[in-house]
């Protein structure tokens, strides 16, 4: 399957792609993971889908949207700082123009082939993060993610470090962690970017 990666701001993302992105998030987070989120007509959106947001997403050759990230600057409101700050403990929330937050990572398992335990869509989505970082002078990403995604990141050899008290926290029914992911040569090599 041939995958194309797209990069758009909240203002520039084509409406049809944005709707597909919200539907993928609904499928992954509401249906598959059973998270209790605000949804509307089979789409998931939240208070962080704002003008400052940037979206990276993958489409297969028939135009089906199969993966996405949301990226927010840490110089404004973002999920780790403003919703899940308990993951930071006494640590100050990152706030720097070269650090961005990753959220709403989703891959459509129905349209992604596995290559050595990691789907081609997942690998390309992680490669796109490196290219995005290079383009926008991003030194690192922070993210609130599940312990299972952290395990995937480590299995891929991606450098990362837990933030805050470095413990797993239960957010709803999801075992979650806060991570710092540097955009460095080790990251580039781990994803073959």
UniProtKB/Swiss-Prot annotation:
> Which EC number(s) does the record attach to this protein?
2.3.1.184
Q: Which PROSITE patterns match?
A: AUTOINDUCER_SYNTH_1, AUTOINDUCER_SYNTH_2
Give the reaction(s) catalysed.
Answer: a fatty acyl-[ACP] + S-adenosyl-L-methionine = an N-acyl-L-homoserine lactone + S-methyl-5'-thioadenosine + holo-[ACP] + H(+)
Task: Give the molecular function GO annotations.
Answer: N-acyl homoserine lactone synthase activity
Domain of life of the organism encoding this protein: Bacteria
Q: Gene3D superfamilies of this UniProt entry?
A: 3.40.630.30
Any one Gene Ontology BP term:
signal transduction
Family, per entry: Belongs to the autoinducer synthase family.
Its function, per the record, reads: Required for the synthesis of N-(3-oxodecanoyl)-L-homoserine lactone (ODHL), an autoinducer molecule which binds to VanR.
Name recorded for this polypeptide: Acyl-homoserine-lactone synthase
> What species does this protein belong to?
Vibrio anguillarum
């Amino acid at each position: 399957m041939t995958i194309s990666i797209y990069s758009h701001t909240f203002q520039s993302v084509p409406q049809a792609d944005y709707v597909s992105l919200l539907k993928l998030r609904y499928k992954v987070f509401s249906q598959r993971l059973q998270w209790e989120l605000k949804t509307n007509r089979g789409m998931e959106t939240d208070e962080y889908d704002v003008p400052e947001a940037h979206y990276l997403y993958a489409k297969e050759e028939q135009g089906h949207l199969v993966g996405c990230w949301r990226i927010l600057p840490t110089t404004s409101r973002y999920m780790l700082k403003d919703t899940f700050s308990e993951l930071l403990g006494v640590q100050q929330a990152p706030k720097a123009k070269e650090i961005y937050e990753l959220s709403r990572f989703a891959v459509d398992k129905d349209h992604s082939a596995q290559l050595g335990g990691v789907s081609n869509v997942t690998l390309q989505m992680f490669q796109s993060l490196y290219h995005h970082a290079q383009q926008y002078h991003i030194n690192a990403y922070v993210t609130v993610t599940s312990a299972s995604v952290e395990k995937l990141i480590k299995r891929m050899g991606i450098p990362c470090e837990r933030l805050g008290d470095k413990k797993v926290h239960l957010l709803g029914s999801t075992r979650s962690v806060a991570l710092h992911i540097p955009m460095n040569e080790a990251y580039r090599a781990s994803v073959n970017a």
